[in-house]
From Swiss-Prot:
This is ATP synthase epsilon chain. HAMAP family: ATP_synth_epsil_bac. SUPFAM superfamilies: Epsilon subunit of F1F0-ATP synthase N-terminal domain. F-type ATPases have 2 components, CF(1) - the catalytic core - and CF(0) - the membrane proton channel. CF(1) has five subunits: alpha(3), beta(3), gamma(1), delta(1), epsilon(1). CF(0) has three main subunits: a, b and c. The lineage of its organism: Bacteria, Bacillati, Actinomycetota, Actinomycetes, Mycobacteriales.
Length: 122
């Protein structure tokens, strides 16, 4: 099966880089699925969204992303997020505690909800 190079990068670090056969992400225009050979596109990621990557080995990588951009060419996908966490690194109980204690902090609530969704989709 055809492959493409994918990079998942947050402002503070690179979360994942490698070969993949499918990337799905939530953009402001809706959910997009990208396979090798996809037409070039630049999309804005939603706040508190989820990105899922199917690696060339068939492994599924899921991350909670908060804002940023998705850049697609025929052979590469670059995800540049304002912040991001791999689902395997997310503490769901801590995210639920943030939801319970956030009050009016809409950004904290959105980030916590995105983290919980990423774990559920992993």
């Amino acid at each position: 099966m055809a492959e493409m190079t994918v990079e998942l990068v947050a402002v503070e670090r690179r979360l994942w880089s490698g070969s993949a056969t499918l990337v799905s992400a939530q953009t402001t225009e809706g959910e997009i699925g990208v396979m090798p050979g996809h037409e070039p596109v630049l999309g804005q990621l939603v706040e508190a969204g989820v990105v899922a990557i199917t690696t060339a080995d068939g492994e599924r990588i899921v991350a909670a992303v908060h804002g940023g951009f998705l850049s697609v060419t025929a052979k590469t996908v670059t995800i540049l997020a304002e912040s991001a966490d791999l689902a395997e690194d997310i503490d769901v109980e801590a995210a639920k505690a943030v939801l319970a204690e956030s009050g009016d902090d809409l950004e904290a609530i959105a980030v916590a909800k995105g983290r919980i969704r990423a774990v559920e989709r992993a």
